[in-house]
Amino acid sequence: MPLYRQEKDWLQYGFELSRATIANWIIECTDKYLRVLYEFYHRLLLSIEFAMADESPIQVLKEEGHEATAKSYMWLFRSGEDDTPPIVLYKYASTRRGDVAKEFLKGFNGYLMADGYTGYNKVQDIKRCCCFSL
């Protein structure tokens, strides 16, 4: 549920709770409890034989140091094995530089399926696979 709706709901009950406070709670809980889980799955992803990657532009309206019209990127990394539950990890970056993939996939030495973006060439010790989507 969007934070502005939660803010309105709390106000209906007579409790003034700002979106900033709710957002800070979410960030704090995520950092404290979910980071460990994310890091566990990140290590697991690096240990498998086949992974997929893609990056998509997103627009962040209020980001410190960036104009509202600047492009940022959400990177997606996914396991490719069929016999296990999929691992899907997102990484936000303010850039599309291949260094993002290089750093995230450091230690991965399997097959990486991605589109033709040359930034993935910066990832060392991998075997590149072509993406067959049209």
Go through each PLM region and give its residues.
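Catalytic center-proximal scaffold of phosphoryl-transfer enzymes
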Residues: 1-134
